[in-house]
């Protein structure tokens, strides 16, 4: 059975902001330098009730290739000493740090429920538990923001890393989820991590994690199947 919620179109009320009344927290799957420096992100937080932001290499690629907003880094003397990964991280970490700072009031006002910004470990590590652990810890330390979320794929190799990172106290955004069984596995990993922290006498009230289902990927697949049926 499918249910739906209709947001009342009350005069003067932004429908997106109205989602907050239903316990929903809108996040934006996008990041770009001018949103951070030009006041656009702050406006979306204040006017639209935006509560979080995610990023990934593909998003940064579009932002970098489609603008001159990152010329200061790309044309710097330091850029000549960095490889492609180094340049990407230089750009991504600065933007994510600034986004975290902009979302910090939301993070504080919601008592750590909202106000997170996600940064992804390298996709090349999706099947590498040890590599994922090392990179996630390095990014967490380098960004240095308590409202950062590290994106880790919910692959078989990613699950042990997710559990350990949560036990270590990192905030984790679990991605690449396409099935209920996969969600059950990451939920069990989350609970196991909390239990391990509790047994060590560590605080679990600040442990934060989200499970990200790739609904758009499913929509795209279903649309293609429907097109075949129509033909």
Regions found by a protein language model. Name each.
Residues 35, 128-134, 152-166, 179-191:
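Active-site-adjacent beta->alpha loops and helix N-cap segments on the catalytic face
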Residues 31-33, 58, 122-126, 153-157, ...:
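Active-site beta-loop-alpha junctions enriched in small/polar residues
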Residues 49-50, 144, 161-172:
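Glycine-enriched alpha-helix->loop->beta-strand junction motifs that scaffold or abut catalytic
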Residues 170-231:
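Catalytic alpha/beta core domains of metabolic enzymes, predominantly
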Residues 55, 59-160:
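Active-site beta->alpha loop and helix N-cap motifs at the rims of alpha/beta catalytic domains
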Residues 2-39:
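N- or domain-start disorder-to-order transition segments that initiate the globular core
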């Amino acid at each position: 059975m499918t249910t739906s919620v209709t947001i009342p179109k009350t005069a003067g009320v932004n429908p997106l902001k109205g989602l907050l009344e239903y316990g929903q927290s809108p996040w934006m799957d996008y990041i770009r330098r001018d949103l951070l420096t030009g006041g656009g992100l702050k406006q979306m937080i204040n006017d639209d009730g935006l509560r979080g932001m995610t990023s990934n290499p593909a998003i940064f690629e579009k932002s970098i290739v489609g603008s001159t907003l990152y010329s200061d880094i790309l044309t710097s003397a330091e850029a000549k000493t960095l490889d492609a990964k180094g340049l990407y991280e230089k750009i991504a970490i600065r933007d994510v740090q600034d986004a975290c700072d902009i979302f910090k009031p939301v993070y504080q006002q919601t008592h750590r429920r909202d106000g997170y910004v996600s940064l992804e470990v390298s996709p090349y590590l999706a099947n590498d538990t040890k590599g994922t652990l090392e990179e996630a810890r390095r990014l967490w330390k380098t960004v240095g923001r308590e409202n950062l979320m590290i994106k880790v794929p919910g692959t078989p190799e990613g699950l042990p890393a997710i559990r350990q990172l949560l036990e270590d106290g990192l905030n984790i955004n679990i991605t690449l989820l396409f099935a209920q069984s996969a969600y059950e596995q990451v939920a069990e990993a989350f609970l196991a991590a909390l239990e391990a922290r509790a047994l060590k006498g560590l605080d679990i009230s600040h442990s934060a994690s989200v499970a990200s289902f790739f609904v758009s990927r499913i929509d795209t697949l279903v649309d293609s199947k429907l097109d075949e049926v129509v033909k």
